[in-house]
Amino acid sequence: MRRLFLFLALLFAAMPAAAQYAPFNPVADYVTPGQDEPGYRYWVGAAPYRPLYVRAFNDYLVNNGVGGVAPTWQLLRTASDWQKCGHQPFEVPPTFAWPNIVAALRFVGAFIEPVVGQVEPVSVYRNPALNVCAGGAKTSTHLTAGAIDMVPLRPITRDALMLALCRIQLDKGSWNNIGLGFYKGLRFHIDSKKAREWGTAGPRGGYGCPAVLTENGIPYRAPIQIAPPILVQPAATLDPLAPRR
């Protein structure tokens, strides 16, 4: 045992200082300068109509009980390839699409965040031209703001995240018309279009959430049908970055 401790101490000492103390920051892999908080402040102040649009969107989320699920400014992030495509880093979705993001946020706030902790959206609405440039599907739910790509802010491994989200998806997502998808790393996708999944695989290579559970030794159970509650947020949870009246 003493030799093991000595080996670990030597291994830690040999690591670069940056690796020893690097904070857990999964957002850094998907958010470039200009799509961060300083970038949002610059963007929202660059046109006189933008604060009005953001305020209306923020008020709609609050009035529909999802104003505290994620900061409003993060829900305005477009695509990670915004700069390469020559588009805006943020965009307020068209009003016809607002109910779609409410449905997705309600599921995230009711079922996902209580399990994996706070999440940060990294891509939500994409206009048609940006969606094409970014390689999105022709029928992508991002076109109607019903999809949210996000990462967890609490330290977790990809396998543990996939297991947690697959349990939620099989228990509650399938009959709530929620789609679940996984990208590389910790980035995952939730949408309110229809029940489906992609990018999920068990540790032995089996496809889909049932394989994720069974290959981790967790038997699949029939879902308990519990509708997501309406999340009523107090006024104190108004987004601090949303423009004030």
Regions from the PLM with identified roles:
Residues 14-16:
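N-terminal signal peptide c-region/cleavage motif recognized by signal peptidases
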Residues 42-194:
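Cell-envelope/glycan interface and biosynthesis
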